[in-house]
């Protein structure tokens, strides 16, 4: 619910300019070694080329893989051209996805605070910088390095 279309646009530009089969925002992709900076969980965004989707359609036999596609691609990681966007600050401790009532309460609080504006990731970061107590709603802990230089 806290999706940022600007990051999606950046991801599409990266994927199309580099002719990638798969591109993603760094959230939690254990296949890539050495990456430590992550976007907030819930800001997930992926680009999958038609070529990769067709390969998954032809190669995936497990019902789970046929439904979700990405796990099959992850297991065949070496055969695809891939890339990612990594943030300049590590936001991996932030949880913006909705899996529990507390997560929903957090997202609702963010929406209430940012009501009336077409907000992006930076607006949410700015809000949480001003009101870090919002993070406590779903058990997040504020880290000073999350303050984004404007």
Where do the PLM segments sit?
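A residue-level structural signature of the nucleotidyltransferase/glycosyltransferase Rossmann-like core
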Residues: 45, 61-62, 95-96
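Conserved catalytic/acceptor-binding region of the Class I
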Residues: 52, 56-73
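Conserved donor-nucleotide/metal-binding helix-loop-beta segment in metal-dependent transferases, i.e.
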Residues: 1-38
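Conserved nucleotide-sugar donor-binding
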Residues: 45-57, 101-105
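Short aromatic/basic micro-patch
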Residues: 2, 47, 97-98
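Conserved alpha/beta core of the MobA/IspD/sugar-nucleotide pyrophosphorylase nucleotidyltransferase superfamily
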Residues: 67-150
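A recurrent flexible, glycine/aromatic-enriched loop bordering the glycosyltransferase active site
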Residues: 32-45, 89-90
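Short, flexible, basic/aromatic active-site loop/helix in glycosyltransferases
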Residues: 20-35, 51-55, 74-84
């Amino acid at each position: 619910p806290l999706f940022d279309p600007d990051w999606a646009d950046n991801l599409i530009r990266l994927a199309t300019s580099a002719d990638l089969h798969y591109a993603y925002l760094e959230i939690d992709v254990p296949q890539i070694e050495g990456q430590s900076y992550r976007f907030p969980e819930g800001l997930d965004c992926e680009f999958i080329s038609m070529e990769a989707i067709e390969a998954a359609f032809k190669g995936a036999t497990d019902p789970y893989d046929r439904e979700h596609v990405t796990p099959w691609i992850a297991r065949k990681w070496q055969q695809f051209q891939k890339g990612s966007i990594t943030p300049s600050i590590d936001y991996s401790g932030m949880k913006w996805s909705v899996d529990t009532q507390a997560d929903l309460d957090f997202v609702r609080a963010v929406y209430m605070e940012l009501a009336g504006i077409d907000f992006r990731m930076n607006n949410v970061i700015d809000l949480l910088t001003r009101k870090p107590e919002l993070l406590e709603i779903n058990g997040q802990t504020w880290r000073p390095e999350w303050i984004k230089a404007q």
